[in-house]
A protein has these predicted regions:
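Rieske [2Fe-2S] iron-sulfur-binding domain
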Residues: 18-106
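Short amphipathic
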Residues: 2-7
Protein backbone atom coordinates (compact mmCIF):
# COMPACT_ATOMS: atom_id res chain seq x y z
CA UNK A 1 0.00 0.00 0.00
CA UNK A 2 1.37 3.40 -0.98
CA UNK A 3 0.86 6.63 0.97
CA UNK A 4 0.68 9.96 -0.81
CA UNK A 5 3.41 12.26 0.52
CA UNK A 6 3.53 15.48 -1.51
CA UNK A 7 3.60 16.98 -4.98
CA UNK A 8 6.89 16.22 -6.78
CA UNK A 9 7.46 19.98 -7.17
CA UNK A 10 7.43 20.38 -3.38
CA UNK A 11 10.88 18.73 -3.34
CA UNK A 12 13.66 20.90 -4.73
CA UNK A 13 15.82 18.86 -7.13
CA UNK A 14 19.07 17.75 -5.48
CA UNK A 15 17.58 17.71 -1.98
CA UNK A 16 15.62 15.59 0.44
CA UNK A 17 12.67 16.09 2.76
CA UNK A 18 11.38 14.23 5.78
CA UNK A 19 7.93 12.62 5.70
CA UNK A 20 5.95 10.69 8.29
CA UNK A 21 4.96 7.33 6.77
CA UNK A 22 2.97 4.94 8.97
CA UNK A 23 4.42 6.65 12.04
CA UNK A 24 8.04 6.38 10.83
CA UNK A 25 10.32 9.23 9.73
CA UNK A 26 11.30 8.63 6.11
CA UNK A 27 13.87 10.65 4.14
CA UNK A 28 12.59 11.26 0.60
CA UNK A 29 15.12 12.38 -2.02
CA UNK A 30 14.77 13.89 -5.48
CA UNK A 31 18.32 13.77 -6.86
CA UNK A 32 17.65 15.50 -10.20
CA UNK A 33 15.05 17.54 -12.10
CA UNK A 34 13.51 14.27 -13.28
CA UNK A 35 10.51 12.72 -11.56
CA UNK A 36 12.59 10.05 -9.80
CA UNK A 37 12.50 9.73 -6.01
CA UNK A 38 14.16 7.51 -3.40
CA UNK A 39 13.18 6.84 0.20
CA UNK A 40 15.17 5.54 3.17
CA UNK A 41 14.82 5.77 6.93
CA UNK A 42 15.58 9.27 8.21
CA UNK A 43 17.49 7.86 11.20
CA UNK A 44 21.29 7.93 11.07
CA UNK A 45 22.25 4.69 12.89
CA UNK A 46 25.67 6.08 13.85
CA UNK A 47 24.37 9.27 15.51
CA UNK A 48 20.93 7.91 16.49
CA UNK A 49 19.44 11.13 15.09
CA UNK A 50 16.74 11.76 12.49
CA UNK A 51 18.87 13.77 10.04
CA UNK A 52 19.47 11.85 6.80
CA UNK A 53 16.91 13.94 4.87
CA UNK A 54 19.27 16.91 5.33
CA UNK A 55 22.30 15.06 3.93
CA UNK A 56 24.16 15.79 0.71
CA UNK A 57 23.36 13.65 -2.34
CA UNK A 58 26.26 12.34 -4.41
CA UNK A 59 27.15 9.67 -6.93
CA UNK A 60 29.79 6.95 -6.57
CA UNK A 61 30.39 4.18 -9.12
CA UNK A 62 27.09 4.93 -10.84
CA UNK A 63 25.00 4.74 -7.66
CA UNK A 64 23.34 7.52 -5.68
CA UNK A 65 24.26 8.03 -2.04
CA UNK A 66 23.43 10.46 0.75
CA UNK A 67 26.09 11.60 3.22
CA UNK A 68 24.85 12.00 6.78
CA UNK A 69 25.15 15.63 7.87
CA UNK A 70 26.53 14.55 11.25
CA UNK A 71 29.17 11.84 10.94
CA UNK A 72 29.37 11.77 7.13
CA UNK A 73 28.72 8.06 6.53
CA UNK A 74 27.20 7.37 3.10
CA UNK A 75 23.95 5.47 2.56
CA UNK A 76 22.81 4.09 -0.80
CA UNK A 77 19.55 5.77 -1.82
CA UNK A 78 18.19 2.62 -3.49
CA UNK A 79 19.15 0.01 -0.90
CA UNK A 80 20.01 1.79 2.38
CA UNK A 81 23.41 0.04 2.51
CA UNK A 82 26.13 1.97 4.34
CA UNK A 83 29.25 2.41 2.21
CA UNK A 84 31.62 2.47 5.17
CA UNK A 85 30.11 -0.33 7.29
CA UNK A 86 27.40 -2.67 5.96
CA UNK A 87 26.40 -3.60 9.53
CA UNK A 88 24.70 -0.20 9.80
CA UNK A 89 22.24 -0.22 6.91
CA UNK A 90 19.05 1.81 7.00
CA UNK A 91 15.65 0.66 5.80
CA UNK A 92 14.80 1.52 2.20
CA UNK A 93 11.24 2.10 1.01
CA UNK A 94 9.60 1.68 -2.37
CA UNK A 95 9.02 5.17 -3.80
CA UNK A 96 7.33 6.38 -6.96
CA UNK A 97 5.78 9.41 -8.61
CA UNK A 98 2.19 8.86 -9.71
CA UNK A 99 0.55 11.70 -11.68
CA UNK A 100 2.95 14.19 -10.10
CA UNK A 101 2.39 12.93 -6.54
CA UNK A 102 5.21 11.31 -4.54
CA UNK A 103 4.09 8.02 -3.00
CA UNK A 104 5.93 5.82 -0.50
CA UNK A 105 5.15 2.18 0.29
CA UNK A 106 4.01 1.91 3.89
Amino acid sequence: MFEQICDINDIVPGTGVCALVSGQQVAVFRPTEEEAVFAISNTDPFAQSNVLSRGLIGEHKGELWVASPLKKQHFNLATGVCMEDERFNVKSYQARVNSGIVEISA
